[in-house]
Design a protein with these regions (language model features):
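Short, compositionally stereotyped local motifs that mark structural "simplifiers"
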Residues: 1-156, 161-173, 197-198
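Conserved ATP-binding subdomain of kinase catalytic cores across diverse folds
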Residues: 101, 126-262
Length: 262
């Protein structure tokens, strides 16, 4: 529209009036060979389970977020889309659903607000002498941001889910929280996803699991739940209640984050 300018970002951050101006179609290429950013962080765990930071570039998608500005302090909502460039040539994604979560990096990885990191709470505990040699990694977790619960630990994000055939199953904004017990300290953490009117919709679209049911929350479990998923598969043909799940390859702010179960 006349008088509006479109600004965009490629790192998950919210577009501002200082973000790059969209003036012509973007030329996007597969960013997988670029250096790791989020998966290179060390402050996402207190676990002593031999966490190894990836020493080669992980697969990456292009996450584009855009918003319109009128120059008078008003802006539209943010539109986000994740592009998986040349992934049809990557065997690891054959016969697998793909899920993308995009959120402002501050929401996950900043020292003050990030829910995926040890954060400022951990640093304050260090300074106060609450952290000392002999504490287990589970005890250390008490002083981290990823151990926070409740609404204060919820952050806005954009969710996209594509089926094994590439069909879009979900594409909407939602809230995310870290979930679990000791797995909160794992580098690959589980999430709870919340659909709320203030983000976009009151419920997730009822296309999942062939139930016709709309869900206001979904669980995105890390690969630690593989054993549970295996047990479910053993009894799914019997008259027993089992948890429905969708195995999916997850990308967090464009970086590959591993296999999860939705």
């Amino acid at each position: 529209a006349e008088g509006l300018s479109i600004r965009y970002t490629l790192d998950g951050s919210e577009p501002t009036e200082d973000s790059p101006l969209y003036t012509e179609p973007l030329i996007l290429t597969d960013p997988s060979s670029s250096s790791n950013v989020w998966s290179a962080l060390e402050n996402i765990t207190t676990s002593d389970r031999n966490y190894k930071i990836p020493d080669t570039p992980v697969d990456k998608a292009a996450a584009v977020s855009a918003a319109a500005f009128d120059g008078e302090g008003n802006r539209s909502g943010t539109v986000t889309c994740t592009y998986f460039i040349d992934f049809d040539e990557k065997e690891d994604y054959e016969n697998a659903a793909v899920l993308s979560l995009v959120t402002d990096p501050e929401n996950l990885f900043s020292q003050e607000e990030g829910i995926y990191v040890r954060g400022s709470l951990y640093e304050e505990a260090l300074e106060a002498g609450l952290i000392y040699e002999g504490l287990s990694w589970i005890e250390l977790m008490d002083y981290t941001h990823y151990y926070l619960e409740g609404m204060s630990s919820e952050r806005p994000a954009h969710l996209e889910l594509y089926s094994v055939y590439g069909d879009a199953l979900l594409n909407q904004s939602c809230g995310i929280r870290i979930r679990g017990n000791e797995s909160r300290s794992f580098p690959q953490k589980s999430f709870t996803l919340y659909s709320r009117k203030r983000y976009e919709k009151e419920s997730f679209d009822p296309v999942l699991f062939d139930t016709g049911i709309s869900y206001d929350s979904l669980i995105l479990n890390n690969s630690k739940t593989l054993k549970k998923v295996f047990f479910f598969s053993l009894v799914e043909d019997r008259e027993a209640a089992v948890q429905e799940y969708i195995p999916c390859q997850v990308f967090l702010n464009g970086e590959y984050w591993g296999m999860y179960y939705l």
